[in-house]
Each structure stands twice: as C-alpha cells, then as structure tokens.
C-alpha cells in the first residue's frame, strides 16, 4: 500500500462519568479495534489505511475541564490547565499525564503533537446519551458535530449575612435570592436563543452557601 495515503481514524474516549451510560466512549474504541480485527481475519486491507485512537481526559468530571486528551494533541492545553487537580486524588493534571508517559513539556508549550492534515477522515461510533433518538424511535443516526463545552466553574453572588429571624425584607440582601434570579434569567435567555434557532443546552450545577453564614 502507498504509505502516502492518509488514514481514516476511528476511536473515542476511554474515560467516562458517573451515570454516563453503558459503554460511554468505549464503544467507539472497541468498534475501531473490531474493524482492524476483521480486516486481518479476512485479509482485507481497504482502500485507505485504518487507525484507531483512544482519548483520555475528555470528560470534565475529573479535572473540571473537558477535552484534555484531544486538546493536548492539538496544542490547546495551557500551563494553567496542567495545574488543575484531579477531584479524587488531588494530583495535578501534569502529574497524571507524566505518569502515563505524556510529554508534559511539549504539552505545556502547546506544541502540536498530531497533524490533522495527515488524516483523511475521522469516524466515531458513540452511544446515545439523551432521550431524542428514543423519542423519535431511531435505532441509529449520523451526527456531523457535537456541542462544545463552555464552563464557568465558580460564579459568586454576594449578599449580607443577617439574622434570618428578625431582618425585614426591605433591609435584606440575600445572596441566595440573587443566585435564584440569575438561574431564572439564564433559563429565559436560553429560551430566547432557542427561538432564534441557536442550538445549545444550559445547566446550573452545584449551588451552595458559606457554611459559616447561611443566613
């Protein structure tokens, strides 16, 4: 085979999240490997080379930021990202990457470690993680792209801590009411954007107060 032929790359991610669904990510990696096995068993090379890739660190659940594995390949991981800590062990991303043999120095300087111009096409098989295909009774679908991920890890609303039993409404500045108002305004903006044809989803995650000043 001509070594100048650009390969088709198949794969997905090998990390998941709690309740991510059976075979989240892994289905795409296994599908690619099975294609390679089938090619070998049947002596079929195909018109283009086939390569399989497995990404790690694609979910945001562990470091608070998504696409770390693929981002590292394309020079998108910053020095600040490498200092993010793993939620269960407290190790930095740099430490975790170094443990598995990644070139952390190259990643820190945002070098391009993978030339995507050398790839003919990318194909990823993935499970359905939402209700749309089930609701529409679709056994499978072709997806041309996925939503990106814009995350604000910490949004703070400040108020005044007061005695909850004696301070009247006109003298209160409750931070929790401001948080509730902010979330409702986000929901309203979301509705307006959907009506304009924008495709996005919005989620408000963990809400908490200062343990020492609940009131």
Segments predicted by a language model, with ranges:
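A non-catalytic alpha/beta surface segment that caps or lines the substrate-entry region
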Residues: 1-3
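A general structural motif
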Residues: 5-7, 47, 118-120
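Alpha-helical metal-binding/catalytic segments enriched in His/Glu/Asp
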Residues: 10-13, 19-58, 151-157, 167-189
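Short, solvent-exposed loop/turn and secondary-structure capping segments
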Residues: 21, 64-65
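Walker A/P-loop NTP-binding active-site region of P-loop NTPases
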Residues: 61
């Amino acid at each position: 085979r001509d070594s100048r032929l650009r390969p088709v790359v198949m794969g997905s991610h090998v990390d998941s999240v709690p309740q991510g669904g059976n075979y989240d990510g892994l289905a795409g990696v296994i599908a690619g490997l099975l294609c390679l096995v089938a090619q070998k068993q049947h002596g079929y090379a195909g018109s283009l080379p086939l390569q399989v890739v497995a990404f790690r660190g694609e979910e945001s659940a562990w470091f608070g930021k998504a696409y770390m594995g693929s981002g590292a390949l394309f020079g998108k991981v910053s020095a600040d990202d490498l200092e993010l800590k793993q939620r269960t062990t407290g190790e930095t991303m740099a430490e975790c990457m170094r443990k598995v043999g990644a070139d952390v120095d190259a990643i820190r300087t945002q070098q391009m470690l993978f030339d995507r111009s050398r790839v003919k096409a990318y194909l990823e098989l993935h499970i359905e993680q939402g209700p749309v295909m089930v609701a529409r009774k679709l056994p499978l679908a072709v997806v041309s792209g996925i939503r990106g991920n814009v995350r604000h890890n910490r949004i703070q609303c400040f108020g005044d801590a007061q005695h909850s039993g004696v301070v009247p409404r006109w003298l209160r500045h409750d931070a929790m009411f401001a948080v509730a108002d902010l979330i409702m305004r986000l929901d309203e903006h979301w509705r307006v954007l959907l009506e304009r044809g924008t495709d996005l989803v919005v989620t408000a995650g963990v809400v908490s107060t200062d343990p020492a000043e609940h009131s």
